[in-house]
């Protein structure tokens, strides 16, 4: 949920050692992108003046161009001040063998779980679900399929179907829309 994400970010951003972990999670959730792509994101992918992300996704090579919202922009400006001298947006905060490198998937997973525990989040939550959560929230908000696809990079509406959950919010929205159209008893 959005509250869980906020709780995670508050904890991660509150400590220097986990700030990059927080930024990776923030970007993945905000832009509904894969953690792996955010973990390897480079400054060249960001147009800070235009407040845009330009990304070629690793899985299917889809290209997306997404806006940078204010909260995320502020964190990126701060991160650029501290880490703009090297290529990665959210590297490990301490050099490894003299270089600032991106987190390995295994190290990211362990560090993310440590932040989740420190934030008091339930053990069943998984960082890998951030893309799904954000996409499901767009579906529930009534965002048109084409717009969702422009964010997620999907080229086929069938690929978005797994994100379309049978939830109370979506059922309520559908029945309310039907009623306002005058097609119920």
What positions do the PLM features span?
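C-terminal catalytic core of tyrosine-transesterase DNA break-rejoin enzymes
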Residues: 26, 30, 36-37, 114, ...
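N-terminal core-binding DNA-recognition domain of tyrosine site-specific recombinases/integrases
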Residues: 14-19, 99-107, 124-129
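Active-site/catalytic core of tyrosine-dependent DNA strand-transfer enzymes
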Residues: 5, 69-122
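A short, basic/aromatic helix-end/turn motif that makes direct DNA contacts
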Residues: 40-46, 128, 149-156, 164-166
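Catalytic-site neighborhood detector that most strongly recognizes the C-terminal catalytic loop/helix
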Residues: 57-61, 145, 152-177
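Well-ordered beta-strand positions in beta-sheet-rich domains
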Residues: 52, 63-67
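Mobile genetic element proteins and their domesticated derivatives, centered on retroelements
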Residues: 8, 112, 160-163
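Basic, Lys/Arg- and aromatic-enriched nucleic-acid-binding interface segment
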Residues: 1-35, 39, 59-62, 131
């Amino acid at each position: 949920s959005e509250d869980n994400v906020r709780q995670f970010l508050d904890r991660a951003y509150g400590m220097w050692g986990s700030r990059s972990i927080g930024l990776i999670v923030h970007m993945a959730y905000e832009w509904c992108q894969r953690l792996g792509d955010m973990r390897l994101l480079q400054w060249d992918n960001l147009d800070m003046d235009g407040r845009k992300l330009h990304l070629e996704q690793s899985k299917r090579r889809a290209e997306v161009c997404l806006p940078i919202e204010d909260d995320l922009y502020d964190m990126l400006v701060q991160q650029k001040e501290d880490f703009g001298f090297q290529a990665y947006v959210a590297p490990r905060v301490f050099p490894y063998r003299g270089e600032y490198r991106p987190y390995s998937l295994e190290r990211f997973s362990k560090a993310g779980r440590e932040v989740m525990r420190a934030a008091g989040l339930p053990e069943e939550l998984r960082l890998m679900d951030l893309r799904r959560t954000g996409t499901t929230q767009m579906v529930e908000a009534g965002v048109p399929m084409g717009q969702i696809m422009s964010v997620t990079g999907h080229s086929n509406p069938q690929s978005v179907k797994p994100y379309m959950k049978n939830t109370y919010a979506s059922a309520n929205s559908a029945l309310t829309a039907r009623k306002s159209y005058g097609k119920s008893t």
